[in-house]
Amino acid sequence: MSLADSDHELVVEELGREPTPAEAALFENLWSEHCAYRSSRPLLSAFESEGEQVVIGPGDDAAVVALPTDGDDDVYITMGIESHNHPSYVDPFDGAATGVGGIVRDTLSMGAYPIALADSLYFGDFDREHSKYLFEGVVEGISHYGNCIGVPTVAGSVDFHDDYEGNPLVNVACVGLTDDERLVTAEAQEPGNKLVLVGNATGRDGLGGASFASEDLAEDAETEDRPAVQVGDPYAEKLLIEANEVLIEEGLIESARDLGAAGLGGASSELVAKGGLGAHIELDRVHQREPNMNALEILLAESQERMCYEVAPENVDRVAEIAEKYDLGCSVIGEVTEGNYVCTFEESEARSASDDSTDERSESGERETVVDVDAYFLGEGAPMNDLPADEPTQPERDLPEIDLETAFEAVLSSPNTASKRWVYRQYDHEVGVRTSVGPGDDAAIVAVREANQGLAISSGAAPNWTDTAPYEGARAIALENATNVAAKGATPLAAVDCLNGGNPEKPDVYGGFTGIVDGLADMCATLETPVVGGNVSLYNDSPSGPIPPTPTLALVGTKDGYEAPPLALEPGAGDLLLVGDRGLESGDVRLGGSEYLAQFDGSDRFPALPEDPQALIETVAAVANDESTLATHDVSHGGLAVSLAEMVTGEAGLEVDIPVPAGTEAGVAGALFHEQPGRVLIQTTDADGVREAFDGVAPVHSLGTPAEDGTLSITVGDLSIDADAAKIREYRSTIAAELG
């Protein structure tokens, strides 16, 4: 990828000369879609990002949100999300691992300590060997890196869809903990302060990673693009986490930026640009892993586990001492100035990682200025794209005729609805001793004892939904994540998004992408949940075609305390109620976007959503926290049949009778398998109290009383089906049975 002719002309006009090779490479990377959001930024104003609890919104390495506490001391969380899609196709292990490392360092940049990770993963058809190879490699990379650095992976999602075959998605979110006194931003503060590079030595790995992520994947990407993929070192990252903690605690950092896309050039120029300042950097002062690196390589390499700090001159020696204590490299590479962003290089003085990085030189030869540009123009000067978009249309109804037994087995055993225990058993989700509710439930709960709050975390998307109806499906994804946290008794606080799309230059693709942006923004605004940050990943396109528009949402909610009602039924107690099923109430059951139709090649319009989603979420959270509530479970992927099956255990079964409203064309399949979000199963000893709570908010249907025989018996109209807990486990073990 090279600088477009129109961009080149704009750069020449601004500089008054031809750019140097290093400048041209910087503009190529920082004006790429990956960094500049040239096709998506015009759409992102749709999101509401402000709120009473929002401290720092979009634009920094991570967002900062204050927890609602009664005490005098403010407790902040940070939220960030990133994609590492192209690298994870080329090298699934390192691509996914370095995605984890990058989002953790974004957390460090804000003066926060990382306390939880959530990953949302998307692959091609599970039956294909290549999809399984990517899946296994990505999960191994995430588990290896996350486990080694001691940050628990507590939530996430996994989806399989044909259109990810040539381009998987790896979206990783991180939550951190900080407070007002520790808070740091990526905005340079003062001319004369030093720029200090701390962490691993710089090599040649990851060169051109930002521009690589801004192009469609080619057929030979797995071999030809391997140099653009970084190699992670989680042990160095762990040391960096702990060193950063000391630096923050001692108040040594004025501002900070993680070295990610475009490496040192990206991090340092963005840091000073946000402060309206410039910098003078001596590239040969950077501690290097490989010999004879030139200026461009040092500037753009995306070697991992590195941080750029702004440090007051009197604190530089102490920063170097701390770096040495944690066996991390440390280079004083330059200083903040009031002028341009300037990088110089003296090849004969280039250092290796073993050189003393803080000593002043006794001699100075003639230096070459390789970059001399306005930092703000470099970071913000890229022109935005005005692209045509085709309005998506929803499919016509074409429902298959499948017997109930076949449909039940197929939907329960689909990799999309099957147990993901094979994935999360590889993650250490209890390290840090904050995890109260771990993976496998609707949402994770992480204890923030500093505020006596439970932090509920849900992350995911639904490619079948947004493939069917981008706008409506994205609205549903926001509601689904909110319902997940509400089912565990939490109230939504804030969210970050990762907006994944194909090649935006294709009008149908850009139309779908526009739909997911607007849909996600509209529902989050309705729920009064600010979207405080995020990431955009476009050009997820390959010879296999574009991916489905995929809006991953990582949403957090808060609750008093750390306990939550379980997902599993309590044997022989109370009543099981279904809350919020508009289809059963009205007879307008739609199967669009369902796993049922994906399994049997049908089509339909997407389901209608609740009329007052905010009231629904507030009421679900309140009921979940009531002492009469014994169990709760969100209903969505796979429909009611899957959610009921997930609640059954060897000790607790259920006999349910589901009425099919007269005139419902979707019939039995619609009742069991439609995927309207905003529905919750509630086991309670106070059924009348639940009905009263939801009066005027959502319909409530009684499904029966949990039994003690471990068998699920479902009657729908004139048809019935039975499956005991062992059979359900067998159906839902698809992934583990295949991968071991």
Which residues does each predicted region cover?
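Flexible loop/turn segments at secondary-structure boundaries
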Residues: 33-35, 85-87, 123-126, 160-165, ...
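Mobile "lid/hinge" segments at catalytic clefts and subdomain interfaces of large enzymes
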Residues: 67-89, 93-97, 101-138, 142-326, ...
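Non-catalytic terminal/interface segments that mediate subunit docking, oligomerization
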Residues: 35, 48, 54-94, 98, ...
